[in-house]
C-alpha cells in the first residue's frame, strides 16, 4: 500500500524516482494504478460555444432596422408637405391684414 502511495506521489511530482519505484515493485498492479491516476488528474473541461444563435438574432435585428428605415421615408415626405403648408399659411393672413390698413 505504501508503494502504491509512493508511486502516485512520485507521478504527481514528476520525479525520476517514479521509475525507480516501478523497478522495485514486484507486482504489475501498482504500475497500472499509476497509469489510471495520471489521466484522472488531467481532466479537461470543454467550453460550450453559443455564439451562433446570437449572430442569427443580430441578423434579424438588422432586417427590422431596414423596415423601420422604409417607414421613415413617408414621414419625411409628410414633413416636407407640412413645411409648404406653413409657408403658404403665413403668407396668406399677412396680405389681408395689410389691405384693410391701407
UniProtKB/Swiss-Prot annotation:
Residues 22-41, 91-102 have a biased composition (Low complexity). Residues 22-102 are annotated as: Disordered. Keywords: Periplasm, Signal. It is found in: Periplasm. One of its GO terms (cellular component) is periplasmic space. Residues 1-21 form the signal peptide. Transmembrane segments: none annotated. It comes from the Bacteria. InterPro entries: Acid_shock. Residues 80-90 have a biased composition (Basic residues). NCBIfam families: acid_shock_Asr. Belongs to the Asr family. Required for growth and/or survival at acidic conditions. This is Acid shock protein. The lineage of its organism: Bacteria, Pseudomonadati, Pseudomonadota, Gammaproteobacteria, Enterobacterales. The gene is asr.
Amino acid at each position: 500500500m505504501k508503494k502504491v502511495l509512493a508511486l502516485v506521489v512520485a507521478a504527481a511530482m514528476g520525479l525520476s524516482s517514479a521509475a525507480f519505484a516501478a523497478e522495485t515493485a514486484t507486482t504489475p498492479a501498482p504500475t497500472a494504478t499509476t497509469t489510471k491516476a495520471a489521466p484522472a488528474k488531467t481532466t479537461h473541461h470543454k467550453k460550450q460555444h453559443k455564439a451562433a444563435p446570437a449572430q442569427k438574432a443580430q441578423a434579424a435585428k438588422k432586417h427590422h432596422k431596414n423596415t423601420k428605415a422604409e417607414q421613415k421615408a413617408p414621414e419625411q415626405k409628410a414633413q416636407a408637405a407640412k413645411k409648404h403648408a406653413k409657408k403658404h399659411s403665413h403668407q396668406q393672413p399677412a396680405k389681408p391684414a395689410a389691405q384693410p390698413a391701407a
